[in-house]
From Swiss-Prot:
Family matches, as SUPFAM superfamilies: VC0467-like
Protein family (similarity comment): Belongs to the UPF0301 (AlgH) family.
TM region(s), chain numbering: none
InterPro entries assigned: AlgH-like (IPR003774)
Coiled coil location: none
Superkingdom of the source species: Bacteria
GO cellular component, one term: cytosol
NCBIfam families (alphabetical): PRK00228.1-1 (NF001266), PRK00228.1-4 (NF001268)
Protein name: UPF0301 protein Meso_0753
């Protein structure tokens, strides 16, 4: 049985870091309709996350070429893992900036540990490492991010805009973009048809 708690219970002593935020049917901002956000940081000062189910027209190879890391003619030499890295539209903030969510088998000084198994790196070094096969075993890239000021996310959850549930690397990295939303709900025992009846946390 799914246990839910009131959004009023989300105080500054709690954190939604390493959680998925699922947009509820009551989401008022159309930019986030049916979106799934992986929360990278959440504290009294605000919150930051990456939308993981919005695709980008640019592919990973395109980004490497644009940054001068790779010549277009060399793209065939990219490791298969690099060619298959998904690029997402991470959110409306700083959309020209890249962020890489990845497994913890690649860590540099600039990496931020989001959980024991998931890190966030936002420097070009990780792109170079991935392009040469020295990067993490699992990764996705996003352009832009989603951000909230102090208390803003808590207010949106209280307004039934979001459902929060624990994240997993399997769903973060392995789910197809078109099925992530429903798969995360299913993993938490939630029927999408009954989503409007669920509030707060799963």
């Amino acid at each position: 049985m799914i246990q839910t708690i009131s959004a009023d219970g989300i105080g500054y002593g709690a954190t939604l870091q390493n959680h998925f935020l699922i947009a509820m049917p009551g989401m008022r901002d159309e930019r986030f309709a049916r979106s799934v956000i992986y929360m990278c940081a959440h504290n009294a000062e605000g919150a930051m996350g990456i939308i993981i189910n919005r695709g980008q027209q640019l592919g990973f190879t395109d980004i490497l070429v644009e940054l001068g890391i790779l010549e277009r003619s060399q793209s065939i030499r990219l490791p298969a893992r690099a060619r298959n890295i998904a690029v997402r539209s991470g959110g409306p903030v700083d959309r020209s900036r890249g962020f890489v969510l990845h497994s913890d088998d690649y860590v540099v000084e600039s990496s931020m540990a989001v959980s024991e198994k998931i890190c966030l790196t936002a420097t070009v070094d990780i792109l170079r490492a991935i392009s040469t096969g020295r990067g993490p075993s699992q990764a996705l890239m996003a352009l832009g991010y989603s951000g909230w000021g102090a208390g803003q996310l808590e207010a949106e959850i209280a307004d039934n805009g979001w459902l929060a549930c624990p994240a997993s690397p399997e769903l973060l990295f392995d789910a197809e973009i078109d099925t992530i939303y429903d798969r995360i709900l299913a993993a938490n025992g939630i029927d999408p048809l009954h989503l409007s009846q669920v509030a707060g946390h799963a």
